[in-house]
Amino acid sequence: MEKNYIQNNGKAKGKIYIGLDHGYGNIKTAHRVFTTGVEAYDEEPIVSTNFVKYREKYYVIGESHLVYQGNKTDSDDFYILTLAGLAEELKFRGLHEAEVVFAVGLPLAWVKSQAADWRAYLMQEKELSFMFQKERYKVHLCGVEIFPQGLAAVHNQGAMPGMNMLVDIGNGTMSILEINDGRPIEKSISTEVFGVHHCMEKIQKELSKRGGVEVPEMLIEPLLRNGIGERTDDVAMVTKRIAESYTEEIIKKLTARGYKEDLIHLYVIGGGGCLLRHFSDLTEKGAVK
């Protein structure tokens, strides 16, 4: 993220680029991460200050978790989350007014089919005036640049000689790309709905069936992210069993796409990398970069 902008009384001089990662688990900018959740209210929230006010409605950010929607342009949710991410990044820079270009991504195999709709969705209003955390922001949106997700994460890996496989496992999708001698292989691109939420849903269903109680994601997420440690309680053991089954399925899918442990360097990014680290033996074998 560039930092050579000049600001004067909270207003940027010249265009600035702001990167946004619209994940189903979290919204990420260069300096902020928050849960992908939004709840709409007609009146100002009583206890929460973490809200967007836009067109006379109030949207509390990050208290809930969006259900996987398939197409992010089907509702206003990701538009409001974009405003929140934009405000977070401007606030970090000490800005309240700016000309902005968004840099955003799409899953690898969906770039061609969804880019036009995604750009139109984010560009639906070029003159933005809204409030976030009770502070006013004014933005002239100059454009939206769309990139294939995942490639930027391995940009600093150097030449990447030999055979490599990039796997981006987010909350909603899993994308795969082969990179041979530093060259991405177009025909190898694939994206499918097999993100971490698939695993989370199975864990919650199993725990509900066993105990008759809905276990919220916030109690399961730390186990998926960090492993179960020394815990032996029911939640931990069910999480371990289902997460191990999920990572086995991931490895099967990678193998079906041509992955060979002794021949191909595996680069895993996204939240799914935590599961492979804690619930498979790939890391112990040194197979994951």
What are these regions (language model features)?
Residues G172, D181-P184:
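Short connector loops/turns at beta-strand edges and beta->alpha or beta->beta junctions
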Residues T29, I176-E178:
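Conserved blade-register residue in beta-propeller folds
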Residues M1-L166, R183-H198, R210, M218-K289:
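Nucleotide/phosphate-binding catalytic cleft detector across ATP-hydrolyzing
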Residues I169-S175:
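Ser/Thr-glycine-rich phosphate-binding loops at phosphate-binding pockets of nucleotides
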